[in-house]
């Protein structure tokens, strides 16, 4: 089953963002490599696996400044700290 994007700007043929295309390639490769293995809760697993490097790289980009990192991510600093603690990154 193919999923057709419902957002008008995507369906009219505008180019995909490089990040979106890269994520799509990785997800396709992951699904292909499953080779029939059962996976449950793929959505949450993918979000979890993407969130950790996202937090680490943004924090590195902001030279450890959590306020700047939170602003760049568009989340409150307390939320960032909670996530860092949750993943054992602090």
UniProtKB/Swiss-Prot annotation:
Top-level taxon of the source organism: Bacteria
InterPro entries assigned: Fis_DNA-bd, Homeodomain-like_sf, HTH_Fis, Trans_regulatory_Fis
DNA-binding region: 66-85
SUPFAM superfamilies: Homeodomain-like
One Gene Ontology term of the molecular function aspect: sequence-specific DNA binding
UniProt keyword annotation of Hydrolase present: no
Annotated coiled-coil segments of the chain: none
Swiss-Prot/TrEMBL GO biological process terms: regulation of DNA-templated transcription
Pfam families: HTH_8 (PF02954)
Key words of the record: DNA-binding
PANTHER family assigned: DNA-BINDING PROTEIN FIS
Entry similarity comment: Belongs to the transcriptional regulatory Fis family.
Protein name, per record: Putative Fis-like DNA-binding protein
